[in-house]
Amino acid sequence: MFITSLKNQKEFELINKLGKKFHEKYFILVIAKNIPKIFLESKYNIFLGIKVSKKLNKKAVVRNKIKRRIKHLIRLICNNSNLKKLAMIIIPRKGFDTADFSVLNHELSKAILDFYNPKK
């Protein structure tokens, strides 16, 4: 399972435009599947973009901790499930840094599974 980060503003805008948004208590997830401009001839399965604002916390140490937690959550979820050709942007909200890891894992996996298995 290969995970890489979104590199430029155009990729972020493309995912925001074509992706589906899930608003959870601790984060906003924008997720899209099979976007050809990014996935064309790529060995990577998952493209991840993380937007951590200074409004969330002024200290860079805390913002970096949030990014590390998000990357670890994505690795756990992707190793447990068979996700392919997926691009997502995660925007954490207030309380993300103090939230329990198991709660974050449950919410994120629920949002990703809702994307793959939409309710009718």
From Swiss-Prot:
Q: Which residues form a coiled coil?
A: none
Asked if the keyword Hydrolase belongs to this entry, the reply reads yes
An example of a Gene Ontology cellular component annotation for this protein is:
ribonuclease P complex
| One GO term (biological process) | tRNA 5'-leader removal
The protein's matches in InterPro entries, at most eight in alphabetical order, are given as: Ribosomal_Su5_D2-typ_SF (IPR020568), Ribsml_uS5_D2-typ_fold_subgr (IPR014721), RNase_P (IPR000100), RNase_P_CS (IPR020539)
GO MF term (any one): tRNA binding
First-level EC class: hydrolase
Can you state which reaction this protein catalyses? Endonucleolytic cleavage of RNA, removing 5'-extranucleotides from tRNA precursor
Q: Which key words are in the record?
A: Endonuclease, Hydrolase, Nuclease, RNA-binding, tRNA processing
* Positions of transmembrane segments: none
- State which Enzyme Commission number(s) the record gives: 3.1.26.5
Reading the lineage from the top rank, the first entry is: Bacteria
Is Ion transport given among the entry's keywords? no
Pfam families in the record: Ribonuclease_P
On subunit structure and binding partners, the annotation says:
Consists of a catalytic RNA component (M1 or rnpB) and a protein subunit.
The cross-references to PANTHER family, in alphabetical order and at most eight, read: RIBONUCLEASE P PROTEIN COMPONENT
Task: Please state which protein family the record places this protein in.
Answer: Belongs to the RnpA family.
Q: Its function? A: RNaseP catalyzes the removal of the 5'-leader sequence from pre-tRNA to produce the mature 5'-terminus. It can also cleave other RNA substrates such as 4.5S RNA. The protein component plays an auxiliary but essential role in vivo by binding to the 5'-leader sequence and broadening the substrate specificity of the ribozyme.
Task: Please state what the protein is called.
Answer: Ribonuclease P protein component
Q: Which organism is it from?
A: Rickettsia bellii (strain OSU 85-389)
Q: Which gene encodes it?
A: rnpA
